[in-house]
């Protein structure tokens, strides 16, 4: 707004009624909804566009309640939300309510009703929020490390075209168990509670070795069932391998078992039932969502 227009606006203020003045005062003194969120976000450590150091960022006004900065090197402006899942997201006054809806595990329609937005907005917000969670998991595990895989039926939910004949609700895949209709998800957890899970393209030795090598410490003890892919990894990396068979009386061998990851499989699938099928395209986001709830429960700070 230019100076002349602003002065004209101020000249109209004496004409307001008392109710209108109270409303104007409330709007002027109430902080922007995004301000409370911005206070919890870390300061800009570098330019999100050219990765220049924070010392190269100069204050460049305000926008939607957020301080903007201009990079001295690339001359582009940014804020703490630039290039994050929350960038360009509207209705900031609803973000905390929607974050709480995620903690409560609400469906899209339930979250939409709680936040007063349409279901399409609620769906888009869900995956904006979950995108940030999908990559937050353990980077290194040691001690006794449990590993096991579970399978989800491949789903093209939400897509206009299907590469196969449609299945009716509650249908089953053309193949059983580990066939091409099923997507393997490998869960890894140590006794310290460090947790990681991976949606795999194929359940073979090459894929498992590539995933587990940077995750499992060389001095760890890997506990698994009798699947040969884990034996291949242990042999290739020199990791101690303890096989625990899924048979009565053999599921626990002293301190070695895979009960933690099997329990997580059960809780994950029971929790997923409320969504009546998850598109494989978004499966990683839902894995991150459940991982956050398992680790923090209702103690998540929104």
Could you describe each region identified by the protein language model?
Residues 1-302:
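Residue-level recognition of single "structural anchor" positions
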